[in-house]
From Swiss-Prot:
It comes from Pelagibacter ubique (strain HTCC1062). Required for accurate and efficient protein synthesis under certain stress conditions. May act as a fidelity factor of the translation reaction, by catalyzing a one-codon backward translocation of tRNAs on improperly translocated ribosomes. Back-translocation proceeds from a post-translocation (POST) complex to a pre-translocation (PRE) complex, thus giving elongation factor G a second chance to translocate the tRNAs correctly. Binds to ribosomes in a GTP-dependent manner. Keywords: Cell inner membrane, Cell membrane, GTP-binding, Hydrolase, Membrane, Nucleotide-binding, Protein biosynthesis. The keyword Cell cycle does not apply. It comes from the Bacteria. GO terms for biological process: positive regulation of translation. It is a peripheral membrane protein. Pfam families: EFG_C (PF00679), EFG_III (PF14492), GTP_EFTU (PF00009), GTP_EFTU_D2 (PF03144), LepA_C (PF06421). This is Elongation factor 4. The lineage of its organism: Bacteria, Pseudomonadati, Pseudomonadota, Alphaproteobacteria, Candidatus Pelagibacterales.
Amino acid sequence: MTKIDHIRNFAIIAHIDHGKSTIADRIIHSCGGLTEREMKAQVLDSMDIERERGITIKAQTVKLNYKAKDGKDYILNIIDTPGHVDFSYEVSRSLYACEGSILIVDSTQGVEAQTLANVYQALDTKHEIVPVLNKVDLPASDLEKTKKQIEEVIGIDTENAIPCSGKTGEGIEDILEQIIVSLPAPEGEKDADLKCLLVDSWYDTYLGVVILVRVINGKISKNMKIKMMSTDQEYIIEKVGVFTPKATDVNELNAGEIGFITTGIKILSETKVGDTICDATKPPQEALPGFKPSKPVVFCGLFPVDSSEYQKLKDGLGKLQLNDASFSYEAESSSALGLGFRCGFLGLLHLEIITERLEREFDINLLTTTPGVVYKVHMNKGDIIELQNPSSLPEPTLIKFIEEPWIKATIITPDQYLGAIIKVCQDKRGVQTNLSYSGNRAVLNYEIPLNEVVFDFNDRLKSMTSGYASFDYEIIGHREGDLVKLGILVNAEPVDALSMMVHKDFAQTVGREVCEKLKDLIPRHNFMIPVQAAIGGKIIARETIKGFKKDVLTKIHGGGARDRKRKLLDKQKKGKARGKQFGKVEIPQEAFIGVLKINKDQ
């Protein structure tokens, strides 16, 4: 059995695309975790979508044996964390399970926004940090400039920063030695009563729910009776194991170690991330501090294009939620789109990945409505309603005021793009709180309503700065806003799937653009179709789709048939009026996608 002072638990943190998973692969290979034949790029990225996009979505863990230069054997527990802002919750959970972090910075790019966010999370968790400068094999690598940036922007000493290359393997041995020297061993007592932190859980077809744990005190072993402190439920442990990175069974996990257990649980919601697991016969007086559960911040409707695929979509969402408890869904019905689901996500990339997985893994054609955020509607009577769907907004006369979520945004950009970025932030109702410089890069801090960045703020930043700017945000609470519900009516019928919350100042512009877009995208019918944008009962924009005109007078010749002509024209007029009254206007899928694009262009 390994002594606790020979264990090192650490997370790998970095901005997206700075080489975390590649360096993790190199460390695994260097410690003999996998043979040359078993190695594949991004070993710890288990989903196909992770490898294709080159991003980490779920935090992955691996236990390695390492013989250091001092001749002693050590156990290294690595957690490879996601780098994208949407998955920062995965990062925070992982950091709680470790004592130290390796901070990877791309030496060709320098410090980026997500680097800052993740480092601050690590420092808040009181981590020791080892800075690593990756991609030194590239001609554009600038070590001194990157070191200076780390010291100026983050405030970490870079005297012992390790230059390395995930591609060639240079510097990997130095990283391993630095981990042993600089990072602390875990604290904990093997002989104390059991206390475990539930770090993560996921569903396995054969084993049921697999629980990733970090043993704080005591030991956890097979056939032991354990208790979840938040639910008071008791279970018998069926399996104990570690990832090497292959799942390997062990007899027990001791204080300081990270591994997995299975207990035959079939429902993921019974395992709350951050919960304390203890010995059912000796429960402790108080639980571990744990951490805040993730809350969805972006909501949208998902509808099957073919209504017969509704059950397939329901089953698909249920299966995805088994492995991703951070997104929520509930049934929703729309007069325009039929039956579907209202889903909540951690951010736009999260939304994109869930919809892509549904389409790919379950072969469902999906229609996604405009993404929105959660508003707090304060009613005249004093109660507060959390609004996810604009079509459910109560009557304006019953509302006192509406609050919308705001974020604190950090943008790091080369200084030549500063003017363009400030203009975009101002257009998005942003309030600048800070501006600082490090060399030729600017660090901007803005407070912006989340609804303004939810569509494509990141994409616009990337396109106007040729991909050099990076963006990160955290939610700072709700603030009162002058918001109205913009309703869209087609042939005097409200289309709930197209309604949206907008700021009063932009309502007319957005309404006009939506009407113009729908006029182009809805096919003509035999009768005239009005397309209107409205706030409450007031119409603020209108376009008209002209009906087809049939010449009913072609067969009538001569000048004496005036009465006959009048009768035919009146009959046609009545038919058109009846068509307008009872005719159903089919709104094609392209119209919904077109409106979504308008929101992106705003």
